[in-house]
Swiss-Prot record:
Protein name: Dual specificity testis-specific protein kinase 2
Record's catalysed reaction(s): L-seryl-[protein] + ATP = O-phospho-L-seryl-[protein] + ADP + H(+); L-threonyl-[protein] + ATP = O-phospho-L-threonyl-[protein] + ADP + H(+); L-tyrosyl-[protein] + ATP = O-phospho-L-tyrosyl-[protein] + ADP + H(+)
Entry-annotated residues carrying Phosphoserine: 219, 369, 456, 460
CDD domains: PKc_TESK (cd14155)
Superkingdom as given in the UniProt entry: Eukaryota
Family membership noted in the UniProt record: Belongs to the protein kinase superfamily. TKL Ser/Thr protein kinase family.
Swiss-Prot/TrEMBL keywords: ATP-binding, Kinase, Magnesium, Manganese, Metal-binding, Nucleotide-binding, Nucleus, Phosphoprotein, Serine/threonine-protein kinase, Transferase, Tyrosine-protein kinase
Region (Disordered): 316-357, 511-530
Domain Protein kinase: 58-313
Primary site of residence: nucleus
Record-linked InterPro entries: Actin_reg-Ser/Thr_kinase, Kinase-like_dom_sf, Prot_kinase_dom, Protein_kinase_ATP_BS, Ser-Thr/Tyr_kinase_cat_dom, Tyr_kinase_AS
Basic and acidic residues bias spans: 316-327
Length: 570
């Protein structure tokens, strides 16, 4: 599909390919924004507003998931037939995180990062439209009976690592990386993984300066021990979460400590887990243990993880052929019906008789060679100074540290906070990759968007909202930073795109007004003159542009009044 059409929605103006097309040339010194003709700016405001905003009634909907903060629908645009995913916020207190997530996703462009498509307006609230991923999430895939050879499992692990490496390169870390938030895409090339759900993302702390300690956020089973202990943490917390995901991939079990063995200090029980890995490649298991190290300083970076996984993938085909050759004479009887399948051996002595999750059959996923007690070729160890193994001689019972703390509610809870000023400003601070880089920005072309704020957005006719429990890119084309912005109640800033450049090239940061996030996202006092969105069929949407040269133009489209104010500075 033509990239220029991939994110466009029928009935709205097409995206422009370059900002210069409307500003009479590009460029900037990195500190100022060049301003073009008034008519160009006004036209760009229309494109920006109406190519990105849609009403809920513009789509047919099919619910595909729900969870703590949102409901997810597969939607099809009635006019164009374009299929997307709609993430509808169900918790008013999470509105600020949702707005931040949309802003952040709009600035990210990577094949393994969920692509942002636009915004849907319903009853005065904004809901994110993203690309539709057709095979659910990683947890669902691992819970299925599908045969997943090690080549597929390592490839999925690699996709997640590369996506997180890109995110960390941008100065952001996820803070809620789970198997539920890793979506699975299946096409003619097989399976691939896409990282999603950036509502709790935060700016990576600068170790060189003292900073306020970050809040405890995330999903407990995947949270790093230092986060659970309310200690200072950084992007290496994502690496621990990733290590837990690798454990899920290797053994095809849940992250719940009733399945995945943990220690009393929230670490991974390496000794117990080694009995559950079957014929896992030893290098892959070693990497998993390194990621789960209790000491954040000893965990590898995602760049290092990606390199290691690439080496493992290059060796896997030969290793798997050799394993299959050795096992061929032994595979007999009913086992041949499900080679390498899931749930082939019961975990009688490892799993309690009463499962905390009765919806799942309690069986361990093993590859074919594991059925015949094939062990890894070498012993895997990890240098973890905080590891507290269970005493096997005394048959110490399985440990669930999440049940010992009342605030963790057995791990069946999710912690979140309001976005900080630093991460909101970071949405406008992301460095662009250098010229000639096509790998990271290959997933989509950017939309031309202006530096404006929206207020009193139009609502759509009422939709019967179902109550259910969760399921869980942009690069800029401009050379210079956008003007400083501000926002009013229910205000949402459009993210100006920036020019693609090399990863190693340093570029000037974009600045914004880091006003109180609670006020700007609807939690503070409403400023005088602002209008609340209550789902009216037609309300005024005002687009303001804070630039030296301004004009005043009014447009009325489908009962919605769009206003741009401007005047020429003397």
């Amino acid at each position: 599909m033509d990239r220029s059409k991939r994110n466009s929605i029928a009935g709205f103006p097409p995206r422009v390919e370059r900002l210069e097309e409307f500003e009479g040339g590009g460029g900037g010194d990195g500190n100022t924004v060049q301003v073009g003709r008034v008519s160009s700016s006004s036209y760009r405001a229309i494109i920006s507003a109406f190519s990105r905003l849609t009403s809920l009634d513009d789509f047919t909907r099919e619910k595909i998931g729900s969870g703590f903060f949102s409901e997810v629908f597969k939607v099809r645009h009635r006019a164009s037939g374009q299929v997307m995913a709609l993430k509808m916020n169900t918790l008013s207190s999470n509105r600020a995180n949702l707005l931040k997530e949309m802003q952040l996703m709009n600035r990210l462009s990577h094949p393994n990062i969920l692509r942002f498509m636009g915004v849907c307006v319903h009853q005065g609230q904004l809901h994110a439209l993203t690309e539709y991923i057709n095979s659910g999430n990683l947890e669902q895939l691992l819970d299925s009976d599908l045969y997943l050879p090690w080549t597929v499992r390592v490839k999925l692990a690699y996709d997640i690592a590369v996506g997180l490496s890109y995110l960390h390169f941008k100065g952001i870390f996820h803070r809620d990386l789970t198997s539920k938030n890793c979506l699975i895409k299946r096409d003619e090339n097989g399976y691939s993984a896409v990282v999603a759900d950036f509502g709790l993302a935060e700016k990576i702390p600068d170790a060189s300066i003292g900073r306020e300690k970050l809040a405890v956020v995330g999903s407990p089973f995947w949270m790093a021990p230092e986060v659970l202990r309310d200690e200072p943490y950084n992007e290496k917390a994502d690496v621990f979460s990733y290590g837990i995901i690798l454990c899920e991939i290797i053994a095809r079990i849940q992250a719940d400590p009733d399945y995945l063995p943990r220690t009393e200090n929230f670490g991974l029980d390496y000794d117990a887990f080694q009995n559950m890995v079957g014929d896992c490649p030893s290098d892959f298991l070693q990497l998993t243990f390194n990621c789960c190290n209790m000491d954040p300083k000893l965990r590898p970076s995602f760049e290092e993880i990606g390199k290691t996984l690439k080496e493992i993938m290059s060796r896997l085909p030969e290793e798997e052929l050799e394993r299959d050759r050795k096992l061929q004479p032994t595979a007999k009887g009913p086992l041949e019906k499900v080679p390498g399948g899931k749930r082939l051996s019961s975990l009688d002595d490892k799993i309690p008789h009463k499962s905390p999750r009765p919806r799942r059959t309690i069986w361990l996923s093993r590859s074919q060679s594991d059925i015949f007690s094939h062990k890894p070729p070498r012993t895997v160890s990890v240098l973890d100074p905080y590891y507290q193994p269970r005493d096997g001689a005394t048959h110490t019972p399985k440990v669930n540290p999440f049940s010992a703390r009342q605030d963790l509610k057995g791990g069946k809870v999710k912690f979140f906070d309001l976005p900080s000023k630093s991460v909101i400003s970071l949405v406008f601070d992301l460095d662009a990759p250098g010229p000639g880089s096509t790998t990271l920005a290959d997933c989509q072309e950017p939309l031309a968007m202006s530096s404006r704020r929206w207020r009193s957005l139009p609502g759509s006719p009422e939709f019967l909202h179902q109550a259910c429990p969760f399921m869980g890119c942009e690069e800029s084309l401009s050379d210079g930073p956008p003007p400083r912005l501000s926002s009013l109640k229910y205000g949402v800033r459009e993210i100006p795109p920036f020019r693609t450049s090399a990863l190693s090239a340093a570029s000037g940061h974009e600045a914004m007004d880091c006003s109180n996030p609670q006020e700007e996202n609807g939690f503070g006092p409403r400023l005088k003159g602002t209008s609340l969105c209550t789902g009216a069929a037609s309300e005024e949407m005002e687009v303001e542009e804070e630039r030296p040269r301004r004009a005043s133009v009014y447009f009325s489209i489908s009962g919605i009044s769009l206003q741009t104010q401007a005047k020429q500075d003397g």
